[in-house]
From Swiss-Prot:
Pathway: Lipid metabolism; fatty acid beta-oxidation. This is 3-ketoacyl-CoA thiolase. GO terms for cellular component: cytoplasm. Its EC number is 2.3.1.16. Catalyzes the final step of fatty acid oxidation in which acetyl-CoA is released and the CoA ester of a fatty acid two carbons shorter is formed. Its main location: cytoplasm. Keywords: Acyltransferase, Cytoplasm, Fatty acid metabolism, Lipid degradation, Lipid metabolism, Transferase.
Amino acid sequence: MSLNPRDVVIVDFGRTPMGRSKGGMHRNTRAEDMSAHLISKLLERNGKVDPKEVEDVIWGCVNQTLEQGWNIARMASLMTQIPHTSAAQTVSRLCGSSMSALHTAAQAIMTGNGDVFVVGGVEHMGHVSMMHGVDPNPHLSLHAAKASGMMGLTAEMLGKMHGITREQQDLFGLRSHQLAHKATVEGKFKDEIIPMQGYDENGFLKVFDFDETIRPETTLEGLASLKPAFNPKGGTVTAGTSSQITDGASCMIVMSGQRAMDLGIQPLAVIRSMAVAGVDPAIMGYGPVPSTQKALKRAGLTMADIDFIELNEAFAAQALPVLKDLKVLDKMDEKVNLHGGAIALGHPFGCSGARISGTLLNVMKQNGGTLGVATMCVGLGQGITTVFERV
């Protein structure tokens, strides 16, 4: 396809190996260092991109405190080859933070406010816990269901509303680990994982080029034996069918179609459309349905036109209703999360939006797809979606 000057193109994507938050490979690596390493290596890999041209580093991060505080985008950028004259901002849309970072860069390019951007995100959930420093307003319960901030309970609610069984969830969780392991063995993650140093279980420093979160030994029987994690009496959502708590970062180089053509760069993809949407916080995980419908309408497409889909696996009980109402549940094995998802790889909040987008682009490239959708739910009732076309 030919590019228009203000088209938004993805030049390259990379991510860290996903590390377990409890005693994992990144336990002695700070979030800023993880981010800076990733940005530096991705720029090194793309020699035609001059770091001096970077308009802004836009980095997603949810818990912006401790080592992730004081604008971690700038903290990380200062430790890379990007000059001090380039800007940096940290953004949060909870789970959708780094996809929002991508959207912010895209909107700037579309409106002529820059040509080259570095976007992505990080979350070190081992160093900065999910609830560190959080003080929810008790008056929120006057406006939304009291349990709306407990993501696992919103997944229970959504699963119950849509008749999702425990066995269906366990099968979905098993699928995630099996596909992620298969992708690892077959080298499908080779282009997206940027190797980095970390510590193994014995405390030895080594270079990791694989995700340590995947459990190939997972069985249906093992998953069936797990107790409910959020609703002890009658619940169906378990640790085995929920996204893992992990540490990781993801990064993309994004630019205008004109600049890519000027530099002789063959992009991975162009953004066709973007959308966000809100839903009742009590069914937080349903957000990808309206946001995807909105994005497809903006692109003049239907779900039947889409070759591959990456849906963030916050919970199996959440993902299955979304796939059902997007009318792709019966095509899941052909189109959806072909390299596994967050149940196997984890969901470091600030990292995941760019991570699923980049993984989607690799799936499209490896399987000859043209159109793809990356979408995810967002805590407290939102959805965010990006439609990509491979070029």
